[in-house]
Regions:
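Flexible, gly/proline-biased loop segments at the beginnings
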Residues: 1-79, 102
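Residue microenvironments linked to proteolytic maturation
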Residues: 35, 52-149
């Protein structure tokens, strides 16, 4: 999950995601367009909320997701790479719609989320992803911080 209320260092400032920051985006007309991709490559589509293959939800800790991977080469390779630990993190693409600054800390209160990405080189080392369930084609995010696409 994108952990709420935990600071993340991003170069010259830190960022804290506040509870509810994703709520509007997930419920909006754009929610079905949110996609899961691999390595920030839009050609490497893994799932989409509108198709039901990507499920995103806020819980008490933050934002979590599940992906039903496609029956493609990438969809078959990714669980193997995750299980081996070669691919172990996640990033996000978003546009901040609500933010407050306290000194060098940005508090995100509302974001337009447009992608989650599974990656071998996450901007946040604390992110993890895991294969879960009897079907190896389902990936579940365990801990995820938010990365602004810049």
């Amino acid at each position: 999950a994108a952990r709420f209320d935990e600071p993340t260092q991003l170069g010259g400032f830190s960022e804290i995601i506040k509870p509810g920051a994703f709520k509007r985006s997930l419920a909006s007309d754009a929610g079905p367009k949110i996609r899961a991709i691999y390595e920030h490559d839009s050609r490497s589509l893994l799932g989409r909320m509108g198709a039901g293959s990507l499920r995103l939800f806020e819980d008490a800790q933050g934002l979590a997701f599940e992906i039903d991977l496609p029956d493609t080469q990438l969809g078959r390779d990714l669980p193997v790479l995750v299980a081996r630990g070669d691919v172990a993190g996640c990033s996000f693409g978003f546009i901040a719609q609500g933010e407050n600054w306290e000194g060098e800390t940005r508090h995100l209160t509302d974001v337009d989320l447009f992608e989650i990405t599974i990656t071998a080189d996450p901007a946040y080392d604390t992110t993890t992803v895991q294969v879960r369930g009897k079907q190896p084609s389902t990936l579940t995010l365990a801990r995820l911080y938010l990365e602004a696409c810049r």
